[in-house]
From Swiss-Prot:
The lineage of its organism: Bacteria, Pseudomonadati, Pseudomonadota, Gammaproteobacteria, Moraxellales. It comes from Acinetobacter baumannii (strain AYE). Residues 408-415 are annotated as: G1. Residues 544-546 are annotated as: G5. Residues 116-135, 170-189, 262-306 are annotated as: Disordered. SUPFAM superfamilies: Initiation factor IF2/eIF5b, domain 3, P-loop containing nucleoside triphosphate hydrolases, Putative DNA-binding domain, Translation proteins. Keywords: Cytoplasm, GTP-binding, Initiation factor, Nucleotide-binding, Protein biosynthesis. Residues 433-437 are annotated as: G2. This is Translation initiation factor IF-2. One of its GO terms (molecular function) is translation initiation factor activity. Belongs to the TRAFAC class translation factor GTPase superfamily. Classic translation factor GTPase family. IF-2 subfamily. The gene is infB. GTP binds at residues 408-415, 454-458, 508-511. GO terms for cellular component: cytosol.
Length: 899
């Protein structure tokens, strides 16, 4: 650093001049203006001050961090029962701080004092132990000598009478020894007791000597370990001492030393000479013993630590069972092989494989049979907990706008009526003039906010109407005044009743001359819809979407009904709602239409819908205008879910991503189990139905639509087209553009590729042109259904239709050498053809069926003979013709059938 002005210094460090002057003043520097010069020493002073202020010490911290990363692999069990290999990465970090010199000197001095004190204490302890050991040995030796002397005296006293005493006789002969006195019982018992006491004393002395030898060995190993731990040059040994390796080595050395001394004591010899050994001296023996048993100690430690311990008794598990469970998953929870579970199920009369699903009761019986404890749990426990937590976080409830669903028959003017209310032109933009998915709108009228759901009226959209009735507060039933109650009108009434939703009848098209509202009311009465003016409880409004007649009256009825229902919701807490519709847009991903029912939905919220979850990245209203939040009864479109959820799925905002993932995975697993169960049931039904029957022609379909609701409706409609003679099978269906994989699938399965309100991408078009696959696009649902019907009709076998061309009566029978029996006939009706099949009838009963061999008029061979004329004919291969028989000529035509 060099001397420079405050302004130059501020420019070099990138800080404002005023801020730098303020910091210099706080550091005690004299500079006050931007042109003042600051020296190098003053710059150092300023830097040290700033470091101190920000919690940093000037100078080096004296710390060093060591990091180590190791990677290994491990095998774990998966849900399928097979082991899979995963990578395990272990990261270690250790920070060493360098102490200052004063601290090092103080620690060295304290360590030296502690070592000197410990050494003095150790020497004093060893001297005391040596003195005590000598005293103990002397006492034991004195006691042992005294007992041996007493024992010898007793033995001498007992053996004295046994000695042979030789006495010379007076006559020069010898005297015989005195006879041996008999040992009494008391003397025998005393001798045995004395012997036992002597043995016990010797055993006690031997045991005490062994304990002292073991203590000496332990002290030797302690000194050796202390030597290694105090050696600065071998600092790494301190780390190793705490490891299982060091424990095994030292422990094995202790054990070997004790065993050696025990063997020497039992042999009656002294302990090993401490000065013996190759290195000489006590230390040499210790180190040699430590080195010799290094390898054996390692093996012993590892064997003791990782040895298998056999279980004392069978493990009993608490097995959690939901409403259904896969056999393989059940076996894994009980830690047994799948075949054991299958055997148990076979004993119970159930024939299943490892991938099949069994119900909760059957699984509980299997678990009890296998000796474990079944725990019955709810599949929706996690979802219920989330809902309860969301309800607890709700604030005060306030009045919310009503949600009104417009329902009725196709072309009765539902969307046009909603257009008049919204003052827009939605119906003109619908393909074919009919609504093909649920439209959600909220309308701000002079009388308040109303949210409308416009449902399709076509027969194929039954599930959509059912969802609309379930998510609504009020149903407006639109009936055309000139058409009356139709099938979808009656279906809408049933949906509204099933959902328990009040109904308001709107008789539309009152501006037409053919309008007959009384007939409509009579037909509604047959469906138990009695209007208020007839003494019932159903409000009726006579409206015209074309002229606007009765619109205000209809809105008043809706708002009055909502006030009577006291609709309330909380605008606070996590949002909760229902999926109205979902689609996949190119470049945007999954677009989900949601009706918020409780709480407030904000951008950035974590949304759980069906088996998918994600954060709201963007949100817009029904007109495509971006918004940041939406309250109760407001329909919105959101982006952020990884895939399009099913229409009708419940939507919930959660705070914990882990819980959202758990609930989504649980829902996906339940859906998978249901699909497996459904497929297995279908396979069984197909096997039973196909027994004894020939193959049925099938029309394969690959279907792609723009929204989920339309996909569901088309799947149901195509499934209902199947008959006993020809089937419709949807190979694949999905939401979004037609892709190359769809074209490949259609080619391999010989399927028809249909797109509803979607188009094929570039790769799919190129592939279809290359392989000659026809892609059909539709925007009106009944046109798609009609084309599939035509394809099914092409698979039907043609019908054989017979037409009687003419009838001739036999008048006389002649014999011919060439033809045999020849009949002279009169043509009664029609025309007799020579090359057409015939039947011979006798008393109006068919007795022969064949063809003519010859047809003549007089002597001429002719091709046909008309009514009222005579002819002669011969039947090929039949000679039993009699008078009054009838010859019937007919023709068989192949007629193409249609559904």
């Amino acid at each position: 650093m060099t001397d420079k002005s405050i302004k130059e210094l501020a420019l070099s460090v990138g800080r404002p001049v005023e801020k730098l002057l303020e910091q210099a003043r706080e550091a005690g520097l004299p500079q006050r203006t931007a042109d003042d010069i600051i020296t190098t020493e003053q710059q150092d002073t300023l830097v040290n001050y700033l470091k101190k202020v920000h919690g940093q010490e000037s100078g080096n911290t004296g710390k060093i961090a060591l990091k180590r990363k190791t990677t290994s692999t491990a095998k774990v069990a998966s849900t399928s029962g097979k082991a899979k290999t995963i990578n395990v990465e272990v990261r270690k970090k250790q920070v060493f701080a360098k102490p200052n010199p004063e601290q090092i000197a103080a620690e060295a001095k304290a360590r030296a004092e502690a070592e000197a004190k410990a050494r003095a204490e150790q020497q004093a302890r060893e001297a005391a132990e040596q003195k005590a050991r000598l005293q103990t040995e002397q006492k034991a030796k004195a006691t042992l000598d005294a007992m041996r002397a007493a024992h010898q005296q007793d033995s001498a006293a007992q053996s004295a009478p046994k000695a042979a005493v030789v006495v010379k006789k007076r006559g020069g002969g010898t005297v015989k020894p005195a006879p041996k006195p008999a040992e009494t019982l008391e003397q025998k018992k005393a001798r045995e007791a004395q012997t036992a006491q002597l043995k016990a004393t010797e055993e006690a002395a031997r045991r005490k000597a062994a304990e002292e030898a073991q203590q000496r060995t332990l002290e030797q190993m302690r000194k050796m370990a202390s030597k290694y731990s105090n050696d600065d040059a071998t600092a790494t040994i301190r780390v190793i001492d705490d490891s299982p390796l060091a424990s095994g080595l030292v422990g094995q050395a202790y054990e070997d030393s004790f065993n050696q001394e025990d063997r020497e004591i039992k042999r009656g010899g002294a302990t090993t000479n401490p000065r013996a050994g190759k290195k000489g001296g006590r230390r040499g023996q210790e180190e040699q013993s430590f080195v010799n048993h290094n390898k054996r100690g390692l093996k012993s430690s590892q064997a003791n630590k990782h040895g298998f311990e056999k279980p004392v008794k069978k493990q009993v598990y608490d097995v959690e069972i939901g409403s259904s469970i896969v056999v393989a998953d059940l076996a894994q929870k009980m830690a047994i092989k799948v075949r054991e579970v299958i055997k148990t199920l076979m004993k119970m009369g159930e024939l299943v494989n490892q991938n099949q699903t069994i119900d909760q009761d059957t699984a509980a019986l299997v678990v009890e049979e296998m000796g474990h404890n079944p725990v019955l749990v709810s599949d929706t426990q996690a979802e219920d907990n989330l809902l309860e937590a969301a309800e607890e976080a709700r604030g005060e409830q306030t009045t919310r706008p009503p949600v009104v669903t417009i329902m009725g028959h196709v072309d009765h003017g539902k969307t046009s009526l909603l257009d008049r209310i919204r003052r827009s032109k939605v119906a003109a933009g619908e393909a074919g003039g009919i609504t093909q998915h649920i439209g959600a709108y909220h309308v701000e009228t002079d009388k308040g906010i109303i949210t409308f759901l416009d449902t399709p009226g076509h027969a194929a959209f039954t599930s959509m109407r059912a969802r609309g009735a379930k998510a609504t507060d009020i149903v407006v039933l639109v009936v055309a005044a000139d058409d009356g109650v139709m099938p979808q009108t009656a279906e809408a009434i049933d949906h509204a009743r099933a959902a328990g939703t009040p109904i308001i009848v709107a008789i539309n098209k009152m501006d037409k001359e053919s309008a007959d509202p009384d007939r409509v009311l009579n037909e509604l009465t047959t469906k138990e819809i009695v209007p208020e003016e007839w003494g019932g409880d159903v409000p009726v409004a006579k409206v015209s979407a074309h002229t606007g007649q009765g619109i205000d009256e209809l809105l008043d009825l809706i708002l009055i009904q909502s006030e009577l229902m006291e609709l309330k919701a909380s605008a606070e807490g996590a949002a909760q709602g229902v999926v109205i519709e979902a689609r996949v847009d190119k470049g945007r991903g999954a677009v989900t239409s949601i009706l918020v029912q409780n709480g407030t939905l904000n951008i950035g919220d974590l949304v759980l819908a069906g088996s998918s979850y994600g954060r709201v990245r963007a949100m817009s209203d029904e007109n495509g205008k971006p918004i940041k939040s939406a309250g109760p009864s407001i329909p919105v479109e959101i982006l952020g879910l990884p895939e399009a959820p099913m229409a009708g799925d419940e939507v919930l905002v959660v705070n914990d991503e882990k819980k959202a993932r758990e609930v989504a995975d649980a829902r996906a697993d339940r859906e998978r189990e249901k699909r497996i169960e459904r497929q297995s049931a279908m396979r069984l039904e197909n096997i039973m139905a196909s027994m004894g029957k020939k193959d049925v022609p099938t029309v394969n379909v690959v279907l792609r639509t723009d929204v989920r609701g339309t996909l569901e409706a088309l799947n149901a409609a195509l499934h209902e087209l199947s008959t006993d003679e020809v089937k419709v099978r949807v190979i694949s269906s999905g939401v979004g553009a037609i892709t190359e994989s769809d074209v490949i699938l259609a080619e391999s399965s010989e399927a028809v590729l249909l797109g509803f309100n979607v188009r094929a991408d570039t790769a799919a078009r190129q592939k279809s042109d290359q392989d000659g696959i026809d892609i059909r696009y539709y925007s009106i649902i009944y046109e798609l259904i009609d084309d599939v019907k035509d394809a099914m009709s092409g698979k039907l076998a043609p019908e054989h239709r017979e037409t009687i061309l003419g009838v001739a009566q036999v008048r006389e029978v002649f014999r011919s050498s060439k033809f045999g029996a020849a009949a002279g006939c009169m043509v009664m009706e029609g025309v007799i053809h020579r090359n057409k099949p015939i039947r011979v009838l006798r008393d109006d009963v068919v007795i022969f069926q064949g063809e003519l061999e010859s047809l003549r008029r007089y002597k001429d061979v002719v091709d046909e003979v008309r009514a009222g004329m005579e002819c002669g004919l011969a039947v090929k291969g039949y000679n039993d013709i009699k008078p009054l028989d009838k010859i019937e000529v007919y023709d068989v035509q192949m007629v193409k059938r249609s559904l």
